[in-house]
């Protein structure tokens, strides 16, 4: 075959292949169109992407096709049932770590809020950490002076438990410098207190919407729990204080359904002082362990029934659990009266276990450092000093702070009882550290069927930050 014949043969073969490719492409297009028409899907080739936004109560559904987006808004599915929460507390042999946010360590280089008063509360689907921000970030000039408790910049926000209080994952809840929050099985309810000291207002939000308010009745810093409120069969309960921190004040129990207040009652407690109660459900009632900021180094106990009747007194145990406090050996205990005459105090908690009690306290008797939880035999009902178990959570070389209680609902655990849990705040910055700010992180522990070794899950941030050196 001469060269010209070779060229003609190669050209003919190439032309044949080209024609075959064109035919195959045409057939492919025809088949694709026929299949799409038969399936009735039109030209929506891609799958559906669903995004949920924190600030809305709807779901955004985006259907993508080539360069065209079809956006459809649908109602967010809501839970159908209220949580029962009438189960007893589970017996705890020890407390295992549940989460630790390390917010201050992360905040040295991350966008983390300056906060105080963190607490945890759970829905049937998740637990969230709530906290009161100062409207500023760590390592920023606006963090200066955030040792102040009440300001117009403070807001209640939340993240999933274990996350740092960062700007990217936090959800706004309420304008507040004092707060509580809980889930009834259907929606979150928050109570946020804000405004001037002599005319503060508490706004009750339900499902993110303002539903009711409580005006200050004592005109002296209306305030609430700084920990989870308690919902039983759709009714939610919390405790508020209005009046002096260092003498007799006024105390009330509130009851709400779907965020609307349906009942309230004054607590008669002459000679006693109640603040910052840590409450939990137990056998159909609400049990609270509170703070006496007036005289007692023993903690007030409040038990609330669904009809808003109540019993009030003090933790009977012969071991004091407030700070500051005297020596254990010098304390006798009382079920009815404040003892110790130390004044001031710190938010704390306890759990009833039959007649026994698990009670948390700082290790230091005079400052908010270290933290331990102790089990006192018959300590709920008698002046017992029989300490049968102790677990250290933070050693006495490191700062602690507030602490409070919550429970894991049976919807989360699939148990027949409510798991007792607690959190411990670890305050850093002013007045103990050389900084311009005050903030905190937290460790969260939950009750288990086994003994857990003591350790120190302290904050661990290295201070001062760059902003403190300017």
Curated annotation (Swiss-Prot):
Gene3D superfamilies: 2.120.10.10. One of its GO terms (biological process) is viral budding from plasma membrane. The keyword Hydrolase applies. It is found in: Virion membrane; Host apical cell membrane. Its cofactor is Ca(2+). The keyword Repeat does not apply. It is a single-pass type II membrane protein. One of its GO terms (cellular component) is membrane. Inhibited by the neuraminidase inhibitors zanamivir (Relenza) and oseltamivir (Tamiflu). These drugs interfere with the release of progeny virus from infected cells and are effective against all influenza strains. Resistance to neuraminidase inhibitors is quite rare. GO terms for molecular function: exo-alpha-sialidase activity; metal ion binding. Catalyzes the removal of terminal sialic acid residues from viral and cellular glycoconjugates. Cleaves off the terminal sialic acids on the glycosylated HA during virus budding to facilitate virus release. Additionally helps virus spread through the circulation by further removing sialic acids from the cell surface. These cleavages prevent self-aggregation and ensure the efficient spread of the progeny virus from cell to cell. Otherwise, infection would be limited to one round of replication. Homotetramer. This is Neuraminidase. The gene is NA.
